[in-house]
Amino acid sequence: MTSTQSPLIILDRDGVINHDSDRYIKSPDEWLPIEGSLEAIARLTHAGWSVAVATNQSGIERGLFDINVLHAIHNKMMNAVAEKGGRIDGVFFCPHTANTACSCRKPSPGLLKILAADSAGRSTRRPSWATPCVTSRREQLLNAISGLLRRGRA
């Protein structure tokens, strides 16, 4: 692997990095990290992984918050990760509800295709291979990192 290549892990946001809510995360104040998630991302960063977030954010289409609020939430998340020594290389989101016929809402592959196209266009940190770990369970994230550690990849 050259210095311009790194493995990529793709994480969901709500329920993996931060606590989820049936009422949606509608402001930066409502975004609360799950214990250990920021440190796990920092550990992946230090091991040379690129970390991306792929998240459904139907609250936009529902009118619960706008794109500026979503960016503020993501800035808070990225700053919190940075404070622990980690980095999120990109955040990709679908703003649609499940009733909208779109290809970007997970589990449809559109969001991952957008992410892949973006990653392929980067000249400084081009992933050499991808490990889609788009999940909504903290335990799955921790198990994935544990497995990577056992294989010497994190």
Predicted regions and their residues:
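Active-site neighborhood of HAD-like aspartate-dependent phosphohydrolases
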Residues: 2-52
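Short, electropositive alpha-helical surface patch
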Residues: 63-78, 102-117
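Acidic, Mg2+-coordinating phosphoryl-transfer loop and its flanking beta/alpha structural elements
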Residues: 128-154
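Anion (oxyanion) recognition and catalysis
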Residues: 42-46, 82, 140
